[in-house]
């Protein structure tokens, strides 16, 4: 897979071996700073630091937006204070809730509907099993609120940039996801994800 790291090494050979991934699946934003400190202990002056968070912090009413932003701001400050020349990329949520994708997903496996039915206004299906399109709009608005806040705190840190909406434009496709876990990309999906974000990385690090 032509990952961001492998693309970085090809474009900037001096970065080879200088890599650390301390991300943890399902982690919340308040774990970012410990992850950052762990990564910096292994690579004290990285050319690039990528921050990807929010997903597991999302609340339908976005009530915790400010606390998520504060967690991200703290992590960014730790990076910049330790390594002022490091370029920091804060990436957004991959894609947005899609009626088309969810319909396709449930058409392939009707049991998926249960996992897309929640007890809040962001549910994709109502209690009667009918598609609830207002839930897609509500969740999209919540995600946008989190990303606006993380973009705001990023803008206050030198050398920090967002992906500028590139990841927002991602379109979910069933064949890009794991057949046993539709919440995670397969190798093909991960390669597509890296390809999509690479131009943003190139501009940021001058590769």
Located regions from the model:
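Active-site-proximal beta-strand/loop segments in catalytic clefts of secreted hydrolases
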Residues: 22-27, 51-56, 79, 91-95, ...
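Substrate-gating cap/lid alpha-helix
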Residues: 99-161
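A structural motif corresponding to the C-terminal end of an alpha-helix
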Residues: 3-16, 75-89, 135, 139-163
């Amino acid at each position: 897979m032509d990952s961001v790291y492998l693309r970085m090494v090809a474009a900037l050979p001096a970065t080879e071996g200088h890599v650390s991934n301390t991300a943890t699946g399902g982690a919340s934003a308040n774990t970012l700073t410990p992850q950052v400190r762990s990564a910096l202990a292994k690579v004290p002056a990285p050319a690039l630091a990528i921050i990807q968070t929010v997903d597991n912090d999302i609340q339908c009413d976005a009530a915790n937006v400010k606390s998520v932003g504060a967690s991200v701001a703290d992590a960014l400050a730790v990076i910049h204070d330790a390594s002022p020349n490091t370029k920091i990329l804060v990436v957004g949520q991959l894609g947005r809730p899609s009626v088309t994708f969810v319909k396709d997903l449930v058409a392939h496996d009707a049991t998926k509907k249960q996992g897309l039915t929640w007890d809040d206004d962001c549910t994709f299906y109502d209690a009667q099993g009918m598609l609830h399109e207002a839930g897609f709009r509500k969740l999209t608005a919540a995600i946008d609120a989190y990303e606006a806040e993380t973009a705001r705190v990023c803008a206050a840190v030198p050398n920090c940039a967002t992906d500028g909406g590139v990841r927002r434009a991602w379109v979910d496709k069933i064949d890009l996801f794991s057949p046993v876990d539709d919440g995670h990309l397969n190798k093909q999906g991960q390669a597509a994800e890296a390809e999509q974000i690479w131009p943003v990385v190139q501009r940021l690090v001058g590769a």
